[in-house]
Amino acid sequence: VCEQSSERIRFIREHYPDVLVTEPEDCKEFVLRNSAHGGADVVLEVAGAEDTFRLAWECARPNAVVTVVALYDKPQILPLPDMYGKNLTFKTGGVDGCDCAEILRLIEAGKIDTTPLITHRFPLTKIEEAYRVFENRLDGVIKVAIAGK
């Protein structure tokens, strides 16, 4: 995991101690050092920051898959001359709505534990406050849960 936030790094180390963590400025070298074939097989770009799109494909090995889940404020540029020879596959998009029922069923059945990720809970009547906290990354928020009742 390449992460900038010290709070999120602490969270990852506490809840997922077997996961390797690095910071953005060391990410490319970190991936090369920890892979056997010149980069990552799969890269998930979830940050959506100014330099994270480039960092994502730079960390990918030739013939890798780069999945972009992030939303960007500005259009991203594909620097094709720099990418030449990598033969990357790009996949884009957010959560697939048709999988939501299955994901919720797995969470309800205890097959997926979201407990460590949900740092804040709000009733539906306070959804504007929930969005404000999440959007502005206040109070160490990771994910927000909204209760309908």
Which role does the model predict for each range below?
Residues 28, 33, 37, 73-120, ...:
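C-terminal substrate-binding/catalytic core of Rossmann-like NAD(P)-dependent dehydrogenases/reductases
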Residues 48, 70-71:
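Short glycine-/small-residue-rich Rossmann-like dinucleotide-binding loops
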Residues 64-65:
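Glycine-centered, small-residue-biased loops immediately flanking beta-strands
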Residues 4-6, 54, 58, 97, ...:
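C-terminal hydrophobic helical "lid"/dimerization subdomain
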Residues 3, 70, 94:
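Conserved acidic E/D residue at the C-terminus of a beta-strand in Rossmann-like folds
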Residues 1-53:
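Adenosine-nucleotide cofactor-binding segment
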Residues 15-16, 61, 85, 109, ...:
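Short, well-ordered coil/turn elements that cap or connect secondary structure elements
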